[in-house]
Amino acid sequence: MKNRLKVLRAERDWTQAKLAEELEVSRQTINAIEKGKFDPSLPLAFKAARLFAMTIEEIFEGD
């Protein structure tokens, strides 16, 4: 799954650790999602969408 997490995080000058803290997950989870090795759960995708004030579709895109 492609996603814009890394770009959105960089626009805010956030580290992976900061984003992980905001989403209440581990830094390793953020790393895996950004690299496309892990697809976020639906609750996590909703949480990210709320955090960035975007829709899930604007952040995550299926392959």
PLM features per residue range, with description:
Residues 11, 50, 60-63:
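Short, charged recognition helix plus adjacent turn
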Residues 22, 33, 62:
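Residues in the recognition helix of alpha-helical DNA-binding motifs
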Residues 43-58:
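DNA major-groove recognition helix of helix-turn-helix/homeodomain DNA-binding modules
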Residues 18, 29, 58:
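Residues in the helix-turn-helix
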Residues 25-38:
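Recognition helix of helix-turn-helix/homeodomain-like DNA-binding domains
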Residues 3-22:
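Short basic helix-loop element that most often maps to the first helix and adjoining turn
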